[in-house]
Amino acid sequence: MKVRPSVKKMCDDCKVIKRKGIVRVICKNPKHKQRQG
């Protein structure tokens, strides 16, 4: 899980979702997991 100020899709499988006010990226590649903070 990477925590960064701006989350971006890193590949075509990445999905940007908003959960409880937190912007997250979920992907089948675990290296691409991110959250904003």
Swiss-Prot record:
Biological process (GO), any one: translation
Domain of life: Bacteria
SUPFAM superfamilies the UniProt entry points to: Ribosomal protein L36
Key words, A-Z: Ribonucleoprotein, Ribosomal protein
Positions in coiled-coil regions: none
GO function terms (MF aspect): structural constituent of ribosome
A single Gene Ontology CC term: ribosome
NCBIfam families on file: rpmJ_bact
Family recorded in the similarity comment: Belongs to the bacterial ribosomal protein bL36 family.
Name listed for the protein in its UniProt record: Large ribosomal subunit protein bL36
Gene that encodes the chain: rpmJ
